Amino acid sequence: MKGLLLLLLLSVMPVQAEQPDIQCPGQNTVERRFCASQKWEESNQALKEQLEPRSLKTWMKATQEVCAAAYAPYRQGTIYPQMVVSCDDRLNRVLLEELKGLGE
């Protein structure tokens, strides 16, 4: 009975997810995808602080379309998502540099 009670209590206790221990740029496809998405999240957050929501939405749509077209030959491969996310990040960072230049 105690074992059942313990099992019941463990099943309702909150579990805290830990961030994976990955050293970027990563050693395999999964790790590289993770690293690429982390970099994209950083550049995307920086753009959110610089652009109006409407401009950001337009920018994101354009970069997604351009990057998807640029890497279309790899669409069936496991590396495709990483390449598209990395492309989005690179374009974001170029725009951030341009915006920085305008503010000086």
Where do the protein language model's features map onto the residues?
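Sec-dependent signal peptide recognition
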Residues: M1-L7
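N-terminal signal peptide c-region/cleavage motif recognized by signal peptidases
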Residues: V12-P14
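N-terminal alpha-helical modules
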Residues: Q16-E104
